[in-house]
Amino acid sequence: MAKNYYDITLALAGICQSARLVQQLAHEGQCDNDALNTVLSGLLQTNPPSTLAVYGGNEQSLKMGLETLQSVLNANRQGPAAELTRYTLSLMVLERKLNANKSAMNTLGDRISQLDRQLAHFDLESETMMSSLAAIYTDVISPLGPRIQVIGSPAILQSTLVQAKIRATLLAGIRSAVLWQQVGGSRLQLMFSRNRLFKQAQSILAHI
């Protein structure tokens, strides 16, 4: 069956957008709020009609992720792009471990479905919701291992709010990685279809 590289590229961009947001948070203590809202909102899309629907039905919402994907596909082994590559690949590894653990998958689904009650009272990007999302990551994803080592400013990384935002963003990255697998993504494509993925990202960016 022919792969749908449009959907695969969108889901990859979702993973990369989360990776870039983690990098921003770790180094600067803040990040692009619109880009953050896009990936966090995707966590709540448990039965989307399309891949793009996970990201609000708007390619523009994944601009950061598409640009980051291009950087990752062209990355050297050092520097900021290498950091992004490591986060992206680490999220893919954790998704595979999650997928192999039915109990963890069920727990994750239950915990995410419970968020609706809180969202009736709190904004998605509120400290309360960030703490709830971070707790899901800590309770369900972290035990699957290996832990993702986040590099950044030690002073910034001491902030409990920044820590919560990073974990919430990593959880959103896992959601995109699940989607990526569902639409036919594989790590082999990152080795053998890099050019095709790069051109697909370029094509989407060209008409945003």
Curated annotation (Swiss-Prot):
Belongs to the HflD family. Its main location: cytoplasm. This is High frequency lysogenization protein HflD homolog. InterPro entries: HflD, HflD-like_sf. Gene3D superfamilies: HflD-like. Keywords: Cell inner membrane, Cell membrane, Cytoplasm, Membrane. It comes from the Bacteria. It is a peripheral membrane protein.
